Amino acid sequence: MKITRWTAEMSPKKEILIQLIQAEGLDYTEVEIRSGLKLTNHRTQMREFIQIIEGELIFNLSGTQFALRPGDKLELPPNTLFSYNNLKSDVCTFLSSKTI
C-alpha cells in the first residue's frame, strides 16, 4: 500500500487528476459514495488506485484506519482486503483505476 498526499496549495481539480491518471496510461471510473455509505471487506483482484476528487473517505486496511482527502491517492496491491466509509455529510467522489 502506498499513500500519496496532495500537498499543493490549490485544491485539486477533477480535470487535473484525470490528466495525471491518463499520463500513467490508466483508464478510470468515477465513483460517488453517499454520506453514511460503507463498503466492507472488499478484496482487490488487481493493482488498484483510488484518488479523491472531493469529500473524505475513512479507509481500514488490516485494522489501520486513515482518512483520504481531496487529491490524496491510494495504491493497493493485488489481493488486499480493505473497507471504507463516508462519515461526512457530503458525497465523496473519487477516481478508481486498475492495472495488472
Feature map (PLM): residue ranges:
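Short acidic-glycine-tyrosine-enriched beta hairpin
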Residues: 63-79
